[in-house]
Swiss-Prot record:
Coiled coil: none annotated. It comes from the Eukaryota. Residues 32-49 have a biased composition (Low complexity). Present with 2360 molecules/cell in log phase SD medium. Keywords: Phosphoprotein. Residues 201-212 have a biased composition (Basic and acidic residues). Residues 167-179 have a biased composition (Polar residues). This is Uncharacterized protein YNR014W. Pfam families: DUF4667. GO terms for cellular component: cytoplasm. Residues 30-60, 129-212 are annotated as: Disordered.
Amino acid sequence: MSSTDIKPCAVNIPVSAHITFHYKSIADRSSSRSSSSSSCSSATSKACSPRGSSVGLPPALSTDNEIVETVLNVSAPVVADPTRPSLFKSNYTAASCLTSDPTSPSLLPSSRRNSVLPASDFHQCAHHKNFQRRASEPQLPSFDNRSSSEMKRSVSYAQHSMMFPISDQQEPQTSASPNDHSDPSCPCNRHHHRRNSVAVKFDKPLYERLET
């Protein structure tokens, strides 16, 4: 099998993401303060973002504007094979979910909205022998018949040093191989978790002005 026969997978393609800053003029704060406070107290299903600062805006916009809301937009990776199932379940945006109708065209999978990954993609492989056994299992040693006598040292420190002398030569420091602690027979060690993770590539942020 050549390298051209291998089809790209959605796992290995970086996910494109960018942050959208929704800003508003500071002069419009007094006019919209009464309407925003009434909407926050009357409806609980709608999003009401607090007024922020100008941190995050470019110098040309940070003088007379303030950030109202920040939205993280994540687009699903484009897979070469259309028949291959994508890792992304559905497109989702927190702001649009609260303010828009679920059946609106803006929430369809074809739009560039946030994508939710299934929880199984974040699971790590764990081996049963890495877990400590329960006290009720018979493999554990029994602590019922303990000796009441204290442990005594039968060899002095001087005799012990003569029997097992400490070498003055330093042990050669060898670099640890990545396959030292891997078992090829285990199916969990045939892949790397980081290689199966989803990489996010952040593009330049976008700035949208909210009109009153």
